[in-house]
Curated annotation (Swiss-Prot):
GO cellular component labels: cytoplasm
Alphabetized InterPro entries for the sequence: ADOMET_SYNTHASE_CS (IPR022631), S-AdoMet_synt_C (IPR022630), S-AdoMet_synt_central (IPR022629), S-AdoMet_synt_N (IPR022628), S-AdoMet_synthetase (IPR002133), S-AdoMet_synthetase_sfam (IPR022636)
Region (Flexible loop): 101-111
UniProt pathway annotation: Amino-acid biosynthesis; S-adenosyl-L-methionine biosynthesis; S-adenosyl-L-methionine from L-methionine: step 1/1
SUPFAM superfamilies documented for this protein: S-adenosylmethionine synthetase
Subunit structure: Homotetramer; dimer of dimers.
Record's protein name: S-adenosylmethionine synthase
Enzyme Commission code: 2.5.1.6
Species assigned in the record: Chlorobium chlorochromatii (strain CaD3)
EC class: transferase
Residues given in the record as L-methionine binding sites: 58, 101, 254, 285
Entry cofactors: Mg(2+); K(+)
Membrane-spanning parts: none
Length: 404
């Protein structure tokens, strides 16, 4: 039998990437609203550019948020603390343009008290379809390429913040990982691309010499530390700052906007995406909460050993609590002789995908031990700190199919 061979690539960006700066500010604002009023309705968008931050959107809340203080703290924590970056926490201008949510939308989301079932009282915040995915490629049940890509830029940030080596690093960075597959199994890393912002070369060192130093440091302190040695061979291509100098970056180099890194936020292109971004949205927005729930369904199906891969789609109508449709596809990897229809039937009985039920199950209105700002860099999935990553339905799924 001939082997199926192909290459697959995913990318990530660091917390200092301009789009991620925007995401983190939006989610930090959301966190503060929810801390004051867990019923807050928030849709917060952020725009960042040279020396400027604009925060806008719609809210319904009893809370009062100091956008200036929140944004400056986020920017400081990321590491934009030097004037030479042309985007600095204490000196950048910050404009808040938050205003009240449309009563038409609010009327559809918050239903009347006389409805008997509390989970039917909260309708979906909008129409749309959301996807969840899980697979057996990594211990986190995530696709390997996106996991590696996330880990690489996260390691760069950890080194930069620790300040003991590679002290020339600046906050902006990107990564990209290409894996070679045989029969749907990742066999090796074919290519890694890392572009990291850095200080100018020291006096007496040429640009070419400086880039060689950076390349060597990234390979030794980042790539070799994170990527398993058996996944890298003499044919693996390593592209470190392939364009050369990368001094101008962050919001000064490129304008950043909330919600522009939706594939980085999810599965690196290994699964479909419904198109709705996450950051800055309270959990009544199913773009966010239902995507988290769909991941929870897919992960539990795979963790229960029912399939090696699982894609879940759920869709909603605005103001309606129950999903319009649910779809499960195990990509011909279902086990124990099960069909996708059988798995879907049991999953629909076990997982309540009404928005209010999702919010209650995960505590999305009152985050405990985590916050939304944490989701806004390095991925919303494959990280155990988040409640939707729990495999707490495995026993029920196994019992439903009478599996030991």
């Amino acid at each position: 039998m001939s082997q199926k061979r192909y290459f697959f690539t995913s990318e990530s960006v660091s917390e200092g990437h301009p789009d991620k700066v925007a995401d983190q500010i939006s989610d930090a604002v959301l966190d503060d609203f929810l801390r004051q009023d867990s019923t807050s309705r928030v849709a917060c968008e952020t725009f960042v550019t040279t020396g400027q931050v604009i925060v806008g959107g719609e809210v319904t809340t009893k809370g009062i948020v100091d956008v200036q203080t929140i944004a400056r703290k986020v920017i400081t924590d990321i590491g934009y603390t030097k004037g030479e970056y042309m985007f600095e926490a204490n000196s950048c201008g910050i404009l808040s343009a938050l205003h009240s949510q449309s009563p038409d939308i609010n009327r559809g989301v918050d239903r009347k008290e006389e409805i008997a079932d509390e989970f039917d009282r909260v309708g979906a915040g909008d129409q749309g379809m959301m996807f969840g995915y899980a697979c057996t490629e990594t211990p986190e049940l995530m696709p390997a390429a996106i996991q590696f890509a996330q880990q690489l830029v996260k390691k760069l940030a950890e080194i930069r913040k620790e300040g003991k080596m590679m002290t020339y690093l600046r906050p902006d960075a990107k990564s990209q990982v290409t894996l070679e597959y045989e029969n749907d199994i990742a066999k090796r890393v074919d290519a890694i691309v890392i572009s990291t912002q850095h200080d100018p070369e020291p006096a007496g060192i040429s640009e070419a010499e400086w880039q060689e130093i950076i390349k060597k440091d990234v390979i030794e302190n980042v790539i070799k530390v994170l990527i398993p040695a058996n996944m890298i061979d003499e044919n693996t291509k390593l592209h470190i700052n392939p364009t050369g100098r990368f001094e101008i970056g962050g919001p000064h180099g490129d304008t950043g906007l909330t919600g522009r890194k939706i594939i980085v936020d999810t599965y690196g292109g290994a699964a479909p995406h419904g198109g709705g971004a996450f950051s800055g949205k309270d959990p009544s927005k199913v773009d966010r909460s239902a995507a988290y729930a769909a991941r929870h369904v897919a992960k539990n199906i795979v963790a229960a050993g029912l399939a090696e891969k699982c894609t879940v789609q759920v869709s909603y109508a605005i103001g309606v609590a129950r999903p319009v449709s649910i779809y499960i596809n195990t990509h011909d990897t279902a086990k124990h002789g099960l069909s996708d229809n059988q798995i879907q039937e049991k999953a629909e009985a076990i997982f309540d995908l009404r928005p209010a039920a999702i919010i209650k199950h995960f505590g999305l209105d009152k985050p405990n031990g985590w916050c939304y700002q944490q989701t806004a860099a390095y991925g919303h999935f494959g990280r155990d700190i988040f409640p939707w990553e729990k495999t707490d339905k495995v026993a029920e799924l196994k019992a439903a199919f009478k599996l030991a």
